[in-house]
Amino acid sequence: MSCAVGDGFMAETFPNLEAEISRYAMRPNPVVARNDPTYIAQQQKIEQSIPERFEEIVRTYPDRLAVKMGARALTYTQLNQAANRIARAILEKCGSGSEPIALLFEHGIDVIATILGVLKAGKFYVPLDPSFPLERNSYMLEDSQTALIVTNNRNVELARTSINKSRALLNIEEIGKALSSDDLGLSIFSHDPSDLSYTSGSTGQPKGILKAHWNVLHIFTSDKGRAAISAEDRLTLLHSVVFGSGKGDLFTCLLNGACLFPFNVKVEGIHGLASWLREERPTVFHSTPAVFRQLLAGLSSHDLPSLRLIRLTGTSISRTDFDLYKDKFAKRALLEILLTSTETNAICSFVTDEAFVFPKHGAPVGYPIRGKRILLLDENGHEVTRGEIGEISVKSRYLSLGYWRRPDLTEARFLPDPDGGDERIYLTGDMGRMLPDGFLIHLGRKDFMVKIRGYRVEPGEIERALLSHSAVKDAGVVACDREPKEKYLAAYIVPRENPGPKVEELRNFLKDRLPDYMIPSTFIFMESLPLTNGKLDRKALPEPDGKRPELNTAYVAPRNETEQKLAQVWKEVLNVHPIGICDNFFDLGGHSLAASHLISKLGQEFHADFQVAALVMFPTIQELAKQIEGESAKNQQWSYLVPLQPGSGHKPVFFLPGGIGGDQEFFVYARLARHVGMQYPFYGLKPRSAEGREPSQASVEEIARDYLKEIRSFQPEGPYSIVGECAGGIIAYEIAQQLREHGQEIALLVLMDSPRP
């Protein structure tokens, strides 16, 4: 017996089959037993020190180019000799023993040689950045308790400002040739400190994170498969070694015998980066999604034929970034996405090509790298069920040593292994969800999540939705404060071309993809977003100025006292000015909660009772003023119908709610109307209790009969389209029954979340 199953059945039954298959192909190597030769070889490399591994590479590739920047280039032998001289000069200044050494260099070859020299001397380095404010560098010098600053001619004067009786200075360009360039052969262990890196702290002061040699060596040994770096590769170094991604690129390259190409994006800019890439022909490109996004805007699909691997680090990768990769590089280069943190180095990664299916929500970051396990924990520290959202936590032997001089913070963020092993658990502060096969989806920072109108919102999800708009080049979203104690969302947009998209267009675009509470109230257009190390600097974004957005509706000033009063109330609620009488409340950033505030203020201003339904029906100042001023409005006959969408050329759709017609339901109607289609007239039906009338005690049949009179007075003949939600579905069903008894046709009857009639 045999049977055939059509493609349609497979597509309907397994809609994510393609994604599952493509992810399965990208899964990392399985965990190996501890007596496996592969595992033993890996452990032997991890138990080395960084200098020991580097010197092995020097012996293997003595004449191969190690680093090149502009006209300056060093082979592995030359780089090793320079590092050895620097190491001896440091030992002459400080003596032996592990201690922090501050480095003050611009992005380039000098800092690379000096890092190796510090490690060869048995010390650990503290990288400073000449472009940082003096106060920040001074804080890191004082907090790290460094006794020596190493620099070069270009930065020596800046370094002199930090010298005191307890801190010396070493200029590497004054090191004499008399110092030996041979390897030092010091005993350095994998658990010894290697570097002290400072990241932004929640208290406003940077916090130092101390790493060991094995942190670097573990990443180097875990870099396998299609993304593995070989001695034939040419790697970009775009990030400063002050940051983890820069150090990662440096050692991934030099501990594999490849050639490193530093480039200063801050100085040369994106246009300079494109020209430099064409000239140097790297095989591996590594950046943040923000830099990648800007770079690709000026490249054709034939550019950079030498690339075989593109690495993107960070959690802000969007569907647009992936589409850019597919359009420009997918035919010849793989894409690797990495999730990293300074405390853990790489956490997750996956390598993909154009076959990958990008998830609808969140940023894909892949599978845990070998030697690390991902736990998703709830607020009580318990693992959540797979598929649920939790804080991403990393369990491993190869975490950083902890926070420098902050045992309290180390104890709070680095937890002991509850099973009593030698591993620890680091709480990243990131939120995520794990798919059934172990693939991790990043859902944003725990501390970036905000509550908007009672809902927890991750700005990154809104940013990714905005980036999927064809006219948006870059986007950032932040939560801002508005009185009284209300937060609202502001979106910062970099358009691909000028003029950019209208605010109404972006708002409607998002309404088809996100809940109403995730739609930004304000949109600010910028030439570029402020970046720090390739990531969005949210603190540097300008405060929203409250200016009226560019709308499809021309500005018309208030013409009389009623319109002026309304405009003033709208301004207070929406924090927007000026407001025209033809401007739609919802196009200005209004939402259900703002509508409730507005209605309350209008009642105080005009000494009258207003309902939110009035704002849904009359969303402009001009329309609302007519209702306030017109005596006919006070005496008009009660109507169940709330017009939500005018439409044209089609029979109307009538919607019956499941509740009692409260404020929030009118906005549910309006949202549903947009999804039905703008061409359809759409009417909500409200009960008498919606405007203070006594709730009906009648039977379902009598309630349906009342509704039906209203419906048929508006549309005498069928066919009819009726939608009912929850309890409203029972009434909708009864209305359909009564219409059929009258010989009328029912074109559409939809019952949503309703009990069986």
What does each model-identified segment do?
Residues 3-196, 211-212, 218, 318, ...:
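AMP-binding/adenylate-forming domain of the ANL superfamily
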Residues 21, 105-109, 123-139, 153-156, ...:
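ATP-dependent adenylate-forming carboxylate-activation enzymes
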Residues 26, 57, 105-108, 129, ...:
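Conserved AMP-binding
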